[in-house]
């Protein structure tokens, strides 16, 4: 995940160059931020597809920046770029708008980071407001609750891809959960789980653990030590703690 809108640079060129860098590092998919101006967003999507080449997966994340009319328009136009999913196209409380977007354009709709516990996920899953549900293990209620959400999604044929955002502690937790995920459907070549791997500049993210969780050619190894597989760097916690002035 990356490709935000930054001040002082040409957004289209900046996002395209960033995705080209991800491709050179071995990543097989990338998620870019949209939800600003629909026309500019579509130009960004086209430029990113050109930079990524034909085989790299591209997801678009609206961060609930559109209304349903805009989201449907963007989805219809962006579909020709081979988009894997359209995340949070509209405000998370507007489930009717989610369903309208899902029905009104061809890209699979994803969402879930803003819904909490199985009770918050129940209606989106049961009414198929989304094609892909994205619970955040640190926001939905932890390991037990995300397991319940995964079971509910499987009952209704909704794909689950965890949302991951924060420090290496959350990355480690998500990796341990993903390692336990049951393929849905069970088959000889199951759908491999995707780890959202934040590439934005955040020195705190990896500083909180003694051994960094990094990728090699776009693949992250699951920590194999007890518990989450990590050891907290308490010196870093002190370093980044708020200081009295």
Task: Label each region the model flagged.
Residues 1-58, 63-80, 104, 199, ...:
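N-terminal capping/lid subdomain adjacent to the active-site entrance of alpha/beta enzymes
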Residues 9, 13, 39, 92, ...:
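Conserved phosphate-coordination/catalytic loops
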Residues 30, 61, 86, 124, ...:
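Conserved, mostly hydrophobic/aromatic
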Residues 66, 92-93:
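Catalytic P-loop NTPase motifs of RecA-like helicase/translocase cores
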Residues 14-15, 42-43, 87-91, 131:
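Short low-complexity stretches enriched in small and charged residues
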Residues 1, 31-35, 59-63, 87-89, ...:
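A cross-family glycoside hydrolase active-site/sugar-binding cleft signature
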Residues 76, 82, 93-110, 115-219:
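Shared catalytic-loop signature of beta/alpha-barrel
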């Amino acid at each position: 995940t990356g490709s935000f809108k930054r001040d002082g640079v040409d957004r289209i060129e900046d996002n395209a160059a960033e995705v080209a860098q991800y491709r050179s590092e071995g990543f097989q998919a990338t998620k870019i931020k949209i939800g600003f101006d629909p026309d500019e967003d579509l130009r960004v999507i086209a430029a990113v597809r050109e930079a990524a080449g034909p085989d790299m997966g591209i997801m678009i994340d609206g961060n609930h920046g559109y209304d349903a009319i805009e989201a449907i328009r963007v989805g219809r136009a962006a579909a020709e770029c081979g988009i894997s999913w359209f995340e949070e196209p509209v405000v998370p409380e507007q489930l009717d708008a989610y369903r309208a977007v899902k029905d009104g354009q061809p890209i699979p709709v994803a969402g879930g980071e803003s819904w909490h516990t199985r009770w918050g996920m129940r209606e989106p899953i049961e009414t198929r407001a989304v094609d892909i549900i994205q619970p955040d293990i640190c926001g939905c209620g932890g390991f037990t609750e995300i397991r319940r959400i995964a079971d509910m999604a499987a009952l209704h044929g909704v794909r689950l891809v965890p949302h991951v955002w924060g420090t290496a502690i959350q990355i480690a937790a998500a990796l341990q959960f993903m390692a336990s995920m049951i393929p849905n459907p069970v088959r000889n070549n199951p759908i491999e789980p995707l780890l959202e791997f934040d590439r934005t500049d955040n020195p705190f993210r990896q500083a909180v653990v003694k051994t960094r969780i990094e990728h090699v050619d776009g693949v992250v190894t699951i920590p194999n030590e007890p518990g989450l597989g990590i050891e907290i760097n308490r010196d870093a916690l002190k370093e980044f703690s708020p200081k009295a002035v």
